Every structure is written in structure tokens, then in C-alpha cells.
Amino acid sequence: MRIHDSRRGRAVDLPPGPLHIHVHGPGLRAFITADVLCRTAARRRSRALLTRSGPPPRPWPLTGFNVPDVPAGDAASAQVVVAEQDPPEAACPKAAHLMLVHPIEPSSLSSLADEDPVTLRMAMLSAPYREPLRLPEQAADARARLGRWRALLAEWARSPGRPMSRRHAADAEAALAQDLDSPAALAVLEELAADPAAAPGAKLETFIHLDLLLALDLVRDIGR
């Protein structure tokens, strides 16, 4: 896996073996980014640990965004620190890699206080984490895409089962492994959804497989 180290100003390879990711500060987008990084790393190595430096974001509970409870922890053993602002030296060990996430304007978040948290998660994953979000426009796009994908999965679930498309799964996972390129991973799913040669059952299994990394509740409407 490779990420952009903001402190060194270049792409770096993450070390092999267990990975400790630490979130500094209460930034919501930093927590979402760190969660996807942790999920992606856990699929490629034996263990990935996610900790935080202080209280989680407010007013939304992180569980609403499909981020598991993140325990408080010490950054001293972290290999990656994720933050929305440059942390003080004590909060980011010299050996650690720093992922700086572009923060969300508080006014943008307050205007979306009634939005579904998973829709906001999709909106955040629709843009590179180092670039600004265009809210509420991207939230509207995310809402439409989620609705369309969930309807497709509910339809595909009525078809015979098929093995997932390993090519599409590998392409999406490779995108996430390259500086967490979530927009490219989402584009792979769009390509698969539109592929007339892929069986509905294969599409379903591939979407489910990748949703374990993206955590977008794509199976929500199956059986409804």
C-alpha cells in the first residue's frame, strides 16, 4: 500500500506487518478516511489498529457513518497519523507518515445536519481525500448513486448466484491501495454495474465484497 506523506511531500510505501493508524483531532473526514484505510490495510495484512487522540466528532455518532468505535490511544506507536490540520510534533512521531485530509467547512456540515450519515460518507469517498468537497452538491450526487446501486443490488439478488468478478474486485482494491483512491474504486463499481457481459449474480457478489471496504450499506434494500 502507498499513501501520500504530507510531511515528506511524496508517496511512500507502508511497512509490512501489523499497522497502527492514529487519528489526530475531531475532524469527521479524517475519521472516515482513516476507517477506509484501516479496512483496506486489514484485508492485506494480519492486523490493522485504529486509535484516536481525543473525543470523536460531534454532533454525529461515528457508528452512524459505519465507523466502529475508535478507542483512545497513544500516537507513539503509530505508523500513520491521519489529521485535518498539521498536528504538533508530539502528536506525530518522526517515524510516522502523515496523511493530511482536506477539512470540511463547518458551515457545509451544519447545512447537512439532517442528511443520512452514510450518504455523507459516500460523498466524502467520491472525492480524493486531499481535495475539497463540494457540499451539498456532492451529497446530492451521493444520495442518487446510493439509491441507484441499492436498487440494482436488490434486483441482482433475485438472479442465480455467480462468483464475483475478480478483475473488478482487484482493480478496485488496487485503487484503494494507491493513496486511498476511493473515487477510482467507485468508478470500477460503476463500470461493473453497466457491463452487459457480467452476470447479475457476479455483480452482486463483487459489490458485496467491496462494500466491506467502503461500508456504504449497499445491501440495505435486498429483500424489501
Regions found by a protein language model. Name each.
Residues 25-29, 137, 177:
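Conserved aromatic-histidine-acidic binding/catalytic patches
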Residues 42-47, 127-137, 195-202:
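Short helix-capping/linker segments at secondary-structure and domain boundaries
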Residues 81-169:
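Catalytic adenosine-cofactor/nucleotide-binding cores of aminoacyl-tRNA synthetases and other
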Residues 23, 124-128, 193:
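Short, histidine-centered active-site or binding-site loop motifs used for metal coordination
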Residues 33, 116-119, 185:
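Catalytic-loop motifs flanking and including active-site residues across diverse enzymes
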Residues 174-224:
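Helix-rich, typically C-terminal accessory recognition domains appended to large enzymatic cores
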Residues 1-114:
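N-terminal Rossmann-like or analogous alpha/beta NTP/dinucleotide-binding catalytic cores
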Residues 59-64, 144-152, 210-219:
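Short, mixed-charge aromatic SLiMs
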